[in-house]
């Protein structure tokens, strides 16, 4: 199975959408003419073009190019150096109410706006958000790739679990079925006095 699906990674499956100049201008927060003027002045690279019939046309801009425009025009949203990154939680005491869908779309929208985003799937063993971003649970993702080692005190921080996605600016901490073990293993570690905090504070 792995031989068959080994190339089924976020990078291998990446399809780069392009935005027309008007759409790019809206995302950047400037006018279309400002983009054209910056390209003519050399502040921005010459746009990618293609020939259709006898007419040469812009093919549109990738999100990486749009983020570069934001940097050039100074419109990219930035967090103050001494500010703590905002944390947004999506939760409900019921299954099937679109928690994952809301989380994924919110993360992608924030990344589209030029922000750096870390989507933490956390304790969900289904791994749906991981799969949405090209990481197939229990094929690409195993217990050691999730938060489980961090929860069990085997890692000092969770940075080892961060993986890139096909969305520029959006990374993910994935999950897989192994997280079914988390509650029983946490309680076992707690009984042994090997947890840095109470289990309910770590979930």
What name fits each language-model region?
Residues 34:
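Residues in the helix-turn-helix
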Residues 1-23, 27, 37-203:
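P-loop NTP-binding core
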């Amino acid at each position: 199975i792995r031989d068959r699906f080994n190339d089924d990674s976020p990078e291998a499956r990446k399809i780069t959408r392009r935005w027309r100049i008007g759409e790019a201008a809206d995302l950047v927060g400037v006018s279309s003419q400002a983009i054209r003027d910056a390209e003519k002045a050399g502040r921005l690279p010459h746009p990618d073009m293609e020939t259709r019939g006898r007419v040469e046309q812009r093919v549109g801009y990738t999100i990486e190019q749009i983020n570069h425009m934001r940097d050039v025009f100074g419109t990219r949203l930035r967090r103050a150096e001494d500010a703590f990154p905002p944390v947004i939680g999506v939760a409900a005491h019921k299954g099937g109410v679109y928690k994952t869908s809301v989380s994924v779309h919110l993360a992608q929208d924030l990344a589209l706006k030029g922000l750096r985003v870390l989507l933490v799937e956390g304790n969900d063993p289904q791994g749906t958000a991981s799969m949405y971003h090209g990481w197939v649970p229990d094929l690409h993702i195993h217990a050691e790739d999730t938060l489980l080692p961090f929860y069990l005190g085997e890692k000092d921080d969770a940075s080892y679990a961060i993986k890139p996605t096909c969305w520029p600016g959006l990374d993910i901490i994935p999950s897989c079925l192994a997280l079914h073990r988390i509650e029983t293993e946490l309680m076992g570690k707690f009984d042994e006095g090997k947890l840095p905090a109470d289990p309910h504070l770590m979930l």
